[in-house]
Amino acid sequence: MSVGTVYGKIGSPRVLFCVSVAAVAGVEVEHVDVQPHNFPADLAAKFPLQKMPVFVGKDGFPLSETLAIAFYLASLNKTRALNGTTAEEKAKVLQYCSFTNSELPGAFRPIIAPRVFGAPYDEQAAKEAETAIALIFARFDEELASKTYLVGSRLTLADIFFTCFLKFGATYVLTKSYLAKYTHIYRYYQTIYHQAKLDAITEPLKFIDQPLPIIKAENKEAAPAKKAEKKKDEKKKNAPKPQAERPAKPPKHPLASAPNGSFDIEEYKRVYSNQDTRSGALPWFFEHFDPENYSVWKVDYSYPEDLKQPVFMTNNLIGGFFQRLEASRKYIFGCCVVIGENGDNTITGAFVIKGHDYVPAFDVAPDWGSYTFTKLDINKPEDKAFIEDAWAWDKPIEGREVADGKVCK
């Protein structure tokens, strides 16, 4: 009988870790694939921050945070000590799990996100990430030289979690030849992969020969029209020379042809800039909003677990995203804010856009795939309150203080 349900994307090493722990412990759980910050209403009511993974027991017991879920599921099997047996082993298991959870996501992100999610590629950040991974692997390789498992003489949560991140890296960037340089990790990965039942949960063990290519932003500009071929016709030689061809104009923005409606988004930008947000700009917006030709969207960063960084760095992430939205600026207005604190924060916000399809408004930014978009209804009190708070910045959002933010106008 199932003890509950794990919610989250199985492609996430953190979600895979929780599902794997249950499988190894012999504890039956269900898995439901959900996107971060796009939980169903009943699940969002239990977990307002909407970060994955989360767990709900059959009796309704709610639990969030990767390590808490994994340790709970492991503890349900009293005969298999996946948490460790002695006090010292339990402490070491927690040490390795904590290290994996805090260090590996940030190390992998600069080299995986541009290949999987289309995030901008930062060469300097990628080099620093590669150096960090090499240091981490060197440390683990040295430790594994004289032992089969990280802690004790049996499989523990420490092994399962580290191997889930090894699989994450080996799926996209860590080639067979790269892993083979770390002889003991290479052997360890193949051993633990099967013991952690990853072959049954996801796919058989395999290696890649080349990292996935970096996703390049599409070139939106039309190529110049080809010159007509010259014909060997004497009359053509005597014909008047045509004027030099001009490059074809770039295609219009997809939203340019959408109905303008009665809402003047440029006027609202001026109102927002010149009037108090609560007493002036927000009442103006709700009075003039045209729901037939415009829509409002909640924007959330899809990988908040990776933002273990200072607030200013997360705010810079918003700034870069907004810069890359330049081609859509005439058709959108919005704010994104950093909620939380240094070392534990995320991005959320609200945008009004022309039309009802968010894709053409945001896909001009190569990193738009790193965000989740949820349509809002201004007639719902909770949605209206979120828009107000996201644009006013003067109240906590989702239970967290607004630390900083930026306006796209």
Curated annotation (Swiss-Prot):
Keyword terms: Elongation factor, Protein biosynthesis
**Domain of life (superkingdom):** Eukaryota
* One cellular-component annotation, GO: cytosol
Q: Can you cite a GO biological process for this protein?
A: translational elongation
Domain named GST C-terminal: residues? 86-212
SUPFAM superfamilies in the cross-refs = eEF1-gamma domain, GST C-terminal domain-like, Thioredoxin-like
Family annotation (InterPro entries): EF-GSTs, EF1B_G_C, EF1B_G_C_sf, Glutathione-S-Trfase_C-like, Glutathione-S-Trfase_C_sf, Glutathione_S-Trfase, Glutathione_S-Trfase_N, GST_C
This protein's record includes keyword Isomerase:
no
Which intervals hold domain EF-1-gamma C-terminal? 251-409
Pfam (any one): GST_N
GO function terms (MF aspect): translation elongation factor activity
Residue spans of biased composition, Basic and acidic residues class: 219-248
Q: Which SMART domains match?
A: EF1G
**The keyword Chloroplast is assigned to this record:** no
Q: Where is this region: Disordered?
A: 219-261
Ranges of residues in domain GST N-terminal: 2-81
Q: What does this protein do?
A: Probably plays a role in anchoring the complex to other cellular components.
Quaternary structure, from the entry? EF-1 is composed of four subunits: alpha, beta, delta, and gamma.
* Protein name per its UniProtKB record: Elongation factor 1-gamma
Q: Tell me which species this is from.
A: Schizosaccharomyces pombe (strain 972 / ATCC 24843)
